[in-house]
């Protein structure tokens, strides 16, 4: 089915899309994925600060590099996470694998 105001899930993303467009940055699938990436990275940074085994990862440079993953998050990144999710059938696990891929670069 082709997307139009008549085939939208609700009037918010259909008829009122132009009035609610700014909300997409917070309530879209893309936003959900982006903020999940942010939460996972901030959790990891905090963990690295508290666990002696990970303490060497808690450098300022590493923190900046990690935060760059979500600060420069793109539509391509979200698409990659959806690709991973199609294999894992788990959205949060897909985010974890995506971050691991970024670590490996």
Predicted features, each with a name:
Residues 2-105:
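A helix-coil-helix interface module used to build multimeric assemblies
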């Amino acid at each position: 089915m082709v997307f139009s105001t008549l085939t939208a899930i609700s009037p918010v993303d259909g008829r009122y899309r132009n009035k609610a467009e700014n909300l997409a940055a917070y309530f879209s699938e893309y936003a959900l994925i982006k903020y999940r990436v942010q939460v996972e990275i901030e959790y990891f940074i905090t963990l690295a600060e508290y666990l002696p085994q990970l303490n060497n990862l808690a450098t300022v440079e590493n923190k900046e590099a990690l935060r760059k993953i979500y600060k420069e998050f793109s539509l391509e990144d979200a698409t990659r996470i959806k690709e991973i999710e199609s294999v894992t059938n788990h959205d949060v696990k897909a985010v974890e694998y995506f971050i691991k891929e970024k670590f490996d670069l």
